[in-house]
Amino acid sequence: MKTKLTTLALIALTSGVFAAPQTFDFKDPKGINNAGFKLDAPLESINGTASGVSGTVSFDPENPGATTGKIVVATASLMVPNSMQRGHMLGAQWLDAAKFPEISFEAKEFKNVKTEGDTTTADVTGTFTLKGISKELTVPVKLTYMKDKLADRMPGQKGDLLVIRAGFSIKRTDFNVNPGQNEDKVSNTIELTLSIAGASAK
């Protein structure tokens, strides 16, 4: 009997230590998830958002440093206040949304991982793809694990949330976005932000 109890205790401990990571889905039916972008040139400041966010992330609350996943933004979902400017932005010279319908970041390695409570900060290295060009980038991220909070965002559903916040910049010319444009009018630096929450339903 004692041996049996010891075995059960070991199984319980082992299952806790090696618990499988959870998969979080970032396709938000509420349409709240968004990516932001800004090109702040001396003559014109272009600011916009994109709501067509999807993707999945594998996250283990017991081992946040092992996080992997891919976040995708639909190019056609990018919006700016000026409709003519938006038309140019989605056209062939800029993002060529018809030919390159997705912008993505695939996380591959987490470094400098620090966790306090349910919040983890880290530098994540991954592949950023824009207009068919892929480059390796390292960006700072903040992950907040919210156990049993899915119902607070989606009433009637049970599960957990993973909130991701990130901000980084890229060079427009590195991705063949409107090359040759006067930088006094269109900044070569594109500042990007990500404000999203993914669901892991139970």
Describe each PLM feature range:
Residues A19-K202:
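Low-complexity, acidic/polar, glycine-enriched regions of mature
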